[in-house]
């Protein structure tokens, strides 16, 4: 139970100390497991929700209230398992989630927060992604409060958990075009990074979509972080070394959207201009870069030959479609094969949109 108590103490102390502890002990997986066990004790079997690349999940009020934003399917569920002050607690959480900003990057706040989310006098993260009952975007607290009251009077639902406790919930749908609204939020950063590193902005946007669906809070089970799911000790360390920096980026650093996009794009630059620079055809290179972003350079070249120079020669001797076919069918990782297909499909289907609307 030590790590669970550590989690509680971390929540009530400076997060930088907790980040340091987790970094020094490689206790991330254990921390997640302990956290999940605690959630199961409170909410019941099959009720564990933990933040992921395309899911924002936050607990509050002694873990009895939680918010879940599913960025892939486009909905928000706010629920409580406690009947004590349930309307008050749900109302408060609805207001907080509608007005939260994308600067709430404290690592442990992705598990639990015991204070009100920071609400700044700036555009909320979900602005224009959620419309109220008058079909208007929500910017001010009184708008969020009014919408919360409407939802609680018309959309409140109740179900039973596996341990026969009542769970009260409100579901809010994001607008159908919620993805493009999130793209717009980070477009300037993507364009600046694209120009700085010479990486196609359509490729950057496609990778962000498949990695996180433009969820700035994204954290994976492998501890990949942020919009581009950068791993501190691999891509993060490589980029820092290229930039003449010591060590690796912190979690808080990578949970900043601008830092994350710059780091992820810098790594794409390293893949296309250093590690895979020997590939001549730009389309073949793009396929290799996409696959390597997910699985690493060695695994990509190893699909063609154990010898890297021979692998590059083989790639250069065949057509781009053949390169894609070999990577898609012969890469040893099913995840990497699927990743290449998804990123490439999104890239092809949206290239003209990215090139015209977002330039």
For each predicted feature, which ranges?
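A short, mixed-charge helix-start or loop-turn motif at secondary-structure junctions
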Residues: 171-176, 246-253
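Short, functionally critical alpha-helical segments immediately adjacent to catalytic or ligand/cofactor-binding
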Residues: 198-219, 230-231, 264-265, 289-294, ...
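Secretory-pathway/luminal and periplasmic proteins that interact with or process carbohydrate-rich
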Residues: 212-221, 237, 295-307
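A short secondary-structure junction motif
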Residues: 170-172, 234-242, 300, 307, ...
């Amino acid at each position: 139970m030590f790590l669970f108590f550590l989690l509680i103490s971390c929540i009530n102390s400076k997060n930088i100390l907790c980040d340091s502890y987790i970094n020094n002990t490689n206790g991330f997986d254990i921390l997640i497991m302990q956290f999940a066990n605690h959630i199961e004790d409170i909410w019941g079997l099959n009720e564990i929700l933990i933040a992921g690349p395309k899911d924002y999940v936050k607990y509050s009020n002694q873990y009895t209230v939680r918010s879940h934003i599913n960025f892939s399917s486009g909905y928000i569920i706010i629920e409580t398992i406690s009947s004590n002050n349930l309307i008050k607690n749900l109302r408060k959480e609805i207001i907080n989630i509608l007005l939260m900003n994308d600067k709430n990057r404290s690592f442990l706040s992705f598990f639990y927060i015991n204070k009100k989310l920071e609400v700044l006098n700036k555009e909320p993260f979900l602005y224009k992604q959620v419309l109220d009952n008058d079909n208007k975007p929500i910017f001010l607290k009184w708008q969020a409060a009014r919408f919360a009251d409407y939802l609680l009077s018309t959309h409140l639902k109740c179900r039973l958990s596996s341990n026969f406790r009542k769970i009260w919930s409100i579901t809010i749908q994001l607008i159908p075009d919620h993805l493009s609204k999130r793209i717009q939020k980070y477009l300037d950063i993507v364009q600046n990074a694209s120009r700085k590193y010479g990486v196609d902005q359509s490729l950057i946007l496609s990778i962000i979509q498949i990695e996180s669906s433009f969820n700035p809070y994204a954290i994976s089970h492998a501890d990949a972080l942020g919009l581009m799911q950068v791993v501190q000790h691999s891509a993060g360390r490589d980029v820092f070394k290229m930039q003449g920096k010591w060590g690796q980026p912190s979690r808080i650093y990578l949970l900043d959207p601008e830092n994350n996009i710059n780091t992820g794009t810098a790594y794409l630059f390293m893949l296309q201009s250093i590690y895979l620079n020997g590939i001549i055809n730009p389309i073949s290179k793009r396929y290799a870069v996409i696959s390597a972003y997910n699985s690493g350079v060695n695994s990509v070249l190893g699909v063609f030959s154990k010898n890297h120079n021979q692998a590059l020669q083989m790639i250069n001797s065949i057509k781009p479609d053949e390169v894609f076919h070999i990577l898609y069918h012969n890469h040893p990782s099913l995840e990497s094969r699927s990743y290449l297909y998804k990123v490439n499909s999104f890239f092809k289907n949206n290239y003209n949109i990215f090139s015209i609307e977002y330039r």
